[in-house]
Amino acid sequence: MKQYRKGLVLVACVLSAILLGSLQRYLVNGIPSQQLAKRWSDDEAFAQVACYFEKDVALMSEQIAGIERSLITALEEAALPAETENGGRNWVDAYSSEGELAVTSNRTTAQVRAFGVGGDFFRFHPFTLLSGTYFDSTDENKDGVILDELVAWQLFGSSNVAGMEVEINGAIYPIRGVVRSDSGMFSEAVEEEAATVYVSYDILAEAYGGSYPIDSYELLIANPVDEFGMTALTNALSMDEKNYEMIEVSARFDFLHRLDVIKHFGVRSMNTKNIVYPYWENRAKGYEDVSALLLILELLFMCYPIAWALNQLRKLYKNRKELKQKLMEKLKNVWQKAYPLLKRTVKTYKLVNRKK
């Protein structure tokens, strides 16, 4: 009975650890902004890197082209082309800055949170489209405007408004699309569900006098060796590392990183830099904490199975001579039973060959 209970506890611990691991993977897969490297390629190694800047030393849009040239040079030095033979790309980037805009429709005006975005922002942040399309780095007009459903309902009383127009800072812009307002764990805490518009960076900059600092820069790049992407971006920025925080997004939920989060669990929340993170990064940090807590529970549940396995190994080692003797005896018995049969088989085979 005692052994039966031990077996049940052992199985329950292992199953609990497996379930917690599955829950962690389910939660992580629920934040698409952290999954571009996985979506981009199953066969080749890519690193997704995010960089967030202090307000007083933030990046300016004029610096983006220089950063991109440096990244292309880093790829070429590693014998990797910026574009592959089949038309694929070994890097994509995006940048954004947060502010506020007054957006006016033919019905009313709404003061909303605004992200001025550039590059392939919507590759990194594939919001669910309710109508219309995204805009990207190929948009030469730089007049892209995307509303979330909260803004669309405030301004028009509907989410099906792609193609209609809004006024921002005295200029008229077509609405490219409407996206669903994300909701989920930590949404309220990080103000994820605040009424938001995503506009071309130039529109936001124009509203703030023609120039506006960039809060975040995101990069997906081929990663032939560990930390290649991080190193390439660090060299491209040529800034004091005290003025920004760089995160390898594609590795933030790996086992070793989760252990590091546990190690610095209290300290990591103390932000000593003048950085205001966008809501998606605050949400990801919350998921990091949850993921680390799940790992702690996984390890606790695995303590008993590991202790049981070590105890079994200890017993085997302690009784190794006796076990060896028993094994030899069993092998001897098997041989004694098998030898006569083998001998008869060989004898029969020889007789058959003689008759031939």
What are these regions (language model features)?
Residues 301-350:
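Juxtamembrane interface at the cytosolic side of transmembrane helices
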Residues 48, 52-55, 64-128, 248-249:
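Short amphipathic beta-strand/extended segments in non-transmembrane regions
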